[in-house]
Amino acid sequence: IVQCLVGSEMCIRDRVDSSVYFNSSQVTNVDNLKTNVSNALQSYSDSVDLSKFGGRFKYSKVLNVIDDVDRAITSNITRVRIRRNLRALINQEAQYELCFGNRFHVNSAGFNIKSTGFTIINEPDICYLTDIPNADGRTGALAIVKPIEETGETRIVIGSAGLVDYIKGEVILTTTLITSTVLNDDIIEVQAFPESNDVVGLKDLYLEFDVSKSTINMVKDTISSGEKISGVGFKVTSSYSNGELKRG
């Protein structure tokens, strides 16, 4: 009997990766500044915008929350990721459907969908989910892959393991027998990059902003501090998604 699970929980979670630029001449303790940024983000997470059905993550508000923490902060580059938890039926054949309710950003090279690790029947090595976009950029194949540590290559274990609908924001994993998960409680975290940084929880999706799994990198603004007025050597942070296989 093949079971079909529509979602594993009715919750979509935001997280951010933020590079916070600061003027080092105005900061005595960088760790304290980082803590203050984290606390400010947690306060926003607890606000009326979020942690509810139909919630909305407001990107511009998050940028302002970070910038307003301290006058030493000069700017921030913040990337948004969304995830849902897939609770696997261990050692049982099952199909899984994860609805994010937000359109996905599509890089034609793939790696738009990422996951934490798991194992499947007849494959002892840790595997991951990823996507192979179709030429139309609207849909793609969901693939199960594994990294080859010796060569740095990614090997396809199952090339057609399901479907990704980038427009609807859906990930469908067809009949698969999962034997274990790297995370506790049989959980596989499945991540995507939203097309819009304003993320909306549809009426049947509970939206949370997970600050605990967000990344805050403090970066010295060498132009503002006067160290490198010309801008040569200034550390630039990309605003776009990366091509890594695993969910970070």
Which residues does each predicted region cover?
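Structured core elements
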Residues: D17-S19, T74, I172
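Broad gene-expression machinery/nucleic-acid interaction feature
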Residues: R13-D17, I77, I187
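Surface-exposed interaction regions enriched in Ser/Thr/Asp/Glu
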Residues: R138-G140, E150-G248
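An aromatic-glycine-centered, glycine-rich loop/turn in mixed alpha/beta architecture
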Residues: Q26-P124, Y128-I132, K246-R247
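Short, basic/low-complexity N-terminal boundary segments at the transition from targeting/disordered tails
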Residues: I121-G152
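Flexible glycine-/small-residue-rich
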Residues: S18-S24, A192-P194
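Single conserved hydrophobic/aromatic residue that forms the stacking wall/gate
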Residues: I1-I12
